[in-house]
């Protein structure tokens, strides 16, 4: 059962990597569709990244209050909503609206899974975990390439959303596999830093 859960966790990290390469691979066609300069991709990417940072900074509070499996489910749902939103966007400004759930879905799930694996598995499992993020990041440009060849850029986002839905179903089916007594930090003994406190840590602002 433990090995099955590890497989699901690896699949979750493939899911995490899937949306990240779509904008770059599809933008040359998208910019023509929206009638905007190529540099405008940066604004969309910046919005997604900003929301990911916000989500990641909120993750300590979420992890201490919500079981990891529910953070995973909610995060994948947000990503699916963002991908579907991108696929139906007919105006450039619409991308910014759907970039919000698109980015929020990436930050907390990353931190939550890392936290879970660090507390429940060996370092080798953690190393392989991040390899599977790369698998997802490699798959999505190929999905977009297939969409551009046989359909439109919109389909690249839609097909990726379908793949995310399939992964979500696997996660839902696997809910009983998650440990009931997940290792959590005791808030009374160890304080979880909030956003303001995290930003005060030397080097954090420069890194962002």
What function would you assign to each model-found segment?
Residues 4-30, 34-36:
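Extracytoplasmic
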Residues 8-9, 91-99, 206-207:
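Short hydrophobic/alpha-helical segments at membrane-entry points of transmembrane helices
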Residues 21, 48-57, 138:
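Residue-level signature of mid-helix packing/kink "hotspots" within the transmembrane helices
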Residues 54-93:
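Conserved MFS/SLC helix-loop-helix module at the cytosolic interface between two early adjacent transmembrane helices
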Residues 82-86, 102, 171:
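MFS-fold secondary transporters
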Residues 94, 128-179:
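Helix-loop-helix hairpin linking two adjacent transmembrane segments in secondary transporters
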Residues 98-132:
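Cytoplasmic helix-loop-helix junction between adjacent transmembrane helices
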Residues 175-208:
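Juxtamembrane intracellular "pre-TM" segments in multi-pass secondary transporters
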């Amino acid at each position: 059962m433990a090995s099955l859960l590890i497989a699901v966790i690896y699949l979750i990290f493939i899911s995490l990597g899937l949306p990240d390469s779509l904008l770059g691979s599809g933008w040359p066609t998208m910019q023509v569709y929206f009638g905007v300069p190529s540099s405008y991709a940066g604004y969309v990417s910046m919005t997604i990244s900003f929301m990911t940072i916000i989500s990641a900074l909120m993750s300590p509070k979420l992890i201490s209050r919500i079981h990891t499996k529910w953070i995973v489910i909610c995060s994948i749902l947000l990503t699916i909503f963002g991908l579907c939103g991108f696929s139906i966007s007919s105006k450039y400004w619409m991308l910014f609206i759907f970039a919000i759930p698109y980015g929020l879905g990436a930050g907390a799930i990353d931190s939550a899974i890392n936290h879970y694996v660090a507390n429940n598995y060996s370092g080798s499992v953690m190393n392989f975990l991040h390899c599977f993020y790369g698998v997802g990041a490699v798959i999505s440009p190929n999905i977009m390439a297939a969409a551009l060849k046989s359909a439109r850029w919109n389909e690249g986002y839609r097909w990726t959303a379908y793949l995310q839905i399939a992964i979500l179903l696997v996660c839902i089916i696997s809910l009983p596999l998650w440990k009931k007594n997940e290792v959590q930090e005791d808030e009374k003994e160890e304080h979880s830093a909030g956003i303001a406190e995290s930003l005060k840590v030397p080097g954090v602002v420069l890194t962002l």
